Amino acid sequence: AKTTAPSVYPLVPVCGGTTGSSVTLGCLVKGYFPEPVTLTWNSGSLSSGVHTFPALLQSGLYTLSSSVTVTSNTWPSQTITCNVAHPASSTKVDKKIEPRVPITQNPCPPHQRVPPCAAPDLLGGPSVFIFPPKIKDVLMISLSPMVTCVVVDVSEDDPDVQISWFVNNVEVHTAQTQTHREDYNSTLRVVSALPIQHQDWMSGKEFKCKVNNRALPSPIEKTISKPRGPVRAPQVYVLPPPAEEMTKKEFSLTCMITGFLPAEIAVDWTSNGRTEQNYKNTATVLDSDGSYFMYSKLRVQKSTWERGSLFACSVVHEVLHNHLTTKTISRSLGK
């Protein structure tokens, strides 16, 4: 298949307005090949409130979306940028999320109907996307995996959406469905989340959502199941800070994860048993032998390192014993 660079579209609330104390912004990365792309907000400095959906393959090209929820005091008074990189096509795009009206203008006067923003006519009616559960939710028995069906571009004139769920063609009725009215183009977005059994996903059962709406000529069905293919356990290595960095007040610990199949993996860090937040993971990268690798980098204060804190990189993958492995490092271990 031909390498194709993505198009990047900012998604903003209707008329730049907000409801309540928060606002949700979005970024749509469309029409690229091959995987992966990396998407960050404000070059990674904005990580709280971010929800990035898995990439979806349609007609040979991938589409990925991400949203971030911030306080209405933050945007639009502060700049928020969606940063997208597609290594295969050497593409880097920084898309600033701009309000649709001047910041000084009151976009939606109180007690008045929200005016429609300039948006293309919805010729095709609603679209439906289905997303797999998060891999950590599937592999850790204490967590609750969900398959999600998202219906977008639902007209306010035809707001009723019927969503039915099936597991191996047997209908189930345990999904939780919500409608969101603050979509970026004056439409509705309906999200239906189906709680599933861990083993149902791992054994390859097929999950189907069936969507009907008056604007659709016939119901839309989307199915998903765990892909089949070769499996290989990851090798995990924790690397101490480079000597050149040790003179600084803050430096990096690196977790290198190599040789795994399939690509779905979860990586996080702890220090002295407490969850760390100051880390960044790369996307998974296809290696020359057909397996995948990735890196995770944790920023550490020199003072914490010198106190002898114990840092641990934890990796969740389906081929590992108990689906989990942890590698540790400290100042004494790193010498």
UniProtKB/Swiss-Prot annotation:
Domain Ig-like: 6-98, 126-225, 234-330
Residues the record marks as carrying a glycan: 185
Pfam family name, one: C1-set
Keywords: Glycoprotein, Immunoglobulin domain, Repeat, Secreted
Lineage top rank: taxon: Eukaryota
Additional record remark: The sequence differs from that of the a allele, from BALB/c mice, at 15% of the positions.
An annotated GO BP: antibacterial humoral response
UniProt entry tagged with the keyword Repeat: yes
GO MF, any single term: antigen binding
Protein's name in the database: Ig gamma-2A chain C region secreted form
One term under GO cellular component: immunoglobulin complex, circulating
